[in-house]
Curated annotation (Swiss-Prot):
Changing residue 474 to A: Loss of palmitoyl thioesterase activity. CPT1 enzymes are comprised of an N-terminal regulatory domain and a C-terminal catalytic domain that are separated by two transmembrane helices. In CPT1A, the regulatory domain, termed N, adopts a malonyl-CoA inhibitory and non-inhibitory state, Nalpha and Nbeta, respectively, which differ in their association with the catalytic domain. This is Palmitoyl thioesterase CPT1C. It catalyses: S-hexadecanoyl-L-cysteinyl-[protein] + H2O = L-cysteinyl-[protein] + hexadecanoate + H(+). GO terms for biological process: carnitine metabolic process; fatty acid metabolic process; regulation of postsynaptic membrane neurotransmitter receptor levels. Changing residue 470 to A: Loss of palmitoyl thioesterase activity. No effect on carnitine O-palmitoyltransferase inactivity. The chain crosses the membrane at residues 53-75, 104-126. Its main location: other. Belongs to the carnitine/choline acetyltransferase family. (R)-carnitine binds at residues 586, 588, 599. GO terms for cellular component: AMPA glutamate receptor complex; axon; dendrite; endoplasmic reticulum; endoplasmic reticulum membrane; glutamatergic synapse; postsynapse. It comes from Homo sapiens (Human). InterPro entries: Carn_acyl_trans, CAT-like_dom_sf, Cho/carn_acyl_trans, Cho/carn_acyl_trans_2, CPT_N. It holds the Pfam family CPT_N.
Amino acid sequence: MAEAHQAVGFRPSLTSDGAEVELSAPVLQEIYLSGLRSWKRHLSRFWNDFLTGVFPASPLSWLFLFSAIQLAWFLQLDPSLGLMEKIKELLPDWGGQHHGLRGVLAAALFASCLWGALIFTLHVALRLLLSYHGWLLEPHGAMSSPTKTWLALVRIFSGRHPMLFSYQRSLPRQPVPSVQDTVRKYLESVRPILSDEDFDWTAVLAQEFLRLQASLLQWYLRLKSWWASNYVSDWWEEFVYLRSRNPLMVNSNYYMMDFLYVTPTPLQAARAGNAVHALLLYRHRLNRQEIPPTLLMGMRPLCSAQYEKIFNTTRIPGVQKDYIRHLHDSQHVAVFHRGRFFRMGTHSRNSLLSPRALEQQFQRILDDPSPACPHEEHLAALTAAPRGTWAQVRTSLKTQAAEALEAVEGAAFFVSLDAEPAGLTREDPAASLDAYAHALLAGRGHDRWFDKSFTLIVFSNGKLGLSVEHSWADCPISGHMWEFTLATECFQLGYSTDGHCKGHPDPTLPQPQRLQWDLPDQIHSSISLALRGAKILSENVDCHVVPFSLFGKSFIRRCHLSSDSFIQIALQLAHFRDRGQFCLTYESAMTRLFLEGRTETVRSCTREACNFVRAMEDKEKTDPQCLALFRVAVDKHQALLKAAMSGQGVDRHLFALYIVSRFLHLQSPFLTQVHSEQWQLSTSQIPVQQMHLFDVHNYPDYVSSGGGFGPADDHGYGVSYIFMGDGMITFHISSKKSSTKTDSHRLGQHIEDALLDVASLFQAGQHFKRRFRGSGKENSRHRCGFLSRQTGASKASMTSTDF
């Protein structure tokens, strides 16, 4: 093959005159450019680390300080109180003619020491300021005097033009809550779902735990909190994710969707080219720390540690425990198409390929007529197998096909060029969205490399999607990247009138490299077994997408309520109607206010929420009575959410106590019971408009339809939701078809009914009032209400397969 000749930089040969070496100038040039890029990257990383280390100060502040000291010295003033003279005495004596140089060096050393002390003081002061969470606990719109003072001080100490990791040294550590408070909150959270007998027994176990073991476990936990960056996040990653032996597919991955109404181009290769270029632009900005840190209220920074592993990252399977492999750089992506794997370079001559050049390379892969090797088509099903099984097979695969395996695992990310279309269609909008969600979550079980940090999925009609492995980071991080990608590839890079990427192709680029897998016979049976298991798991998932458009965030805002709390309480009503009982409910809340914080659980099924649900199902209760109970439930949920965000949650603390007890070989019936609980309703809100790269009000059809995840329990639901602009909410519901207790479509109908019933309690929502509140009768008005969102502009930009 032609590219094989470019694999080496010289060719030795033996002649009658001796050995000769023929150097290849193009390859040597590539080696030089690659080394130059590597050195530039190292220098850039060093400089950025220096800038973030001295933040909120800057190198200019050192120069100002040094100049001030020199000026004072020139005016025969000694701001060092004699220290500079002592420093001069310690410097070598180079003779009288260099006496002035010694003074300058002494001033520079003193300025550096003083500058370092000031930086340390700023770090400590900012860390103390950021440890204040009173602002979080105050009612929305009612800012107290201490909070106003705090905001002013944060502005003073925060510096200017922060880089992505500028605040990392100043973030406070996550506090260890009081074990008595945690146990009390836990008992309060399970009271609505336990019988009196079960609750009394749980309370006895809790008191026994507090009396016998809690103080010892808490002591070890506090010791870790003083030593480690975060007392729980590393254990959460290890024991919840990396030590789990379940398949990643459905159990530990989640998906993100493209624009709901718009597909910028129907050309698969063009969409892939722009998307990959946008993703690598994001990586470039990430490496240079040009992405600004996320700030709450425009002032309070969130931890940025999770951004480090977005790209060049793979979860490597192990027999007992996986590990995360992260490379500093990668100049290729791994591509899967029609059962074949390709290694496609993303850079040429030290520069990122243009979108048009990337489109050209993807088109070459699409046009490649070569068939898949035996069992190559289903090879990726191994990544959907139980982790221990995949680890054993990978050991053999690494021996037999090391080069191909390294090309996939060492890629910046994985790209799957699917042969089928996806997205919203005119013929059957509901079914098409459900199929779209299922394709992103599980695919066919063998067309995603689930170990990669994320897989970019490009469908045949140009629709995009993302499948994300969960261990390395949480949804807001990948959502931030995805938001940048969609906005950049559509609004900044754009497409020509014929749907191609802008620019010109590069015919000099080598063909993408087809990966060769030398698969031994013993692996064939493992692949077949993994494929069978992946298909069973994939076909068992029931995905349902509910675009609800009768009202959205603007209506909830007019009711003066938290939009997230509004949805959470409505979900309790919907789930009760679906199952006839209350259950443990998991809502993910972020703890990135702290260094290396990840998530905390909000236990949304509260006593207050249950009281509201019972009132809604009681025909004797009036609307004002239900509304009063609803407001109480919302206030309680808000209090729990704020407590979780400020490090005063329940579940991460109990989890860490349980891990310590296992290390100490202590048996705690209470912690064992807590650890064995099943979350039958797992929920999460998908963040949106984190970067504000375009105004969604001016482009209402360019809204992402969010994403979803699999259920946490075999007899439970996974529900995610996203506020699309001001007038639409999209729900992603998942469950297991094998369960006789769940039905994603049924819950979707209950969610729509519950939203309308709750809205009808408010004066602004009287037009939603229905005759039989709580009856579960279908209201067809909102079944296809989202179709009215389509505008003339969006119609013109949609492909034939889109609505």
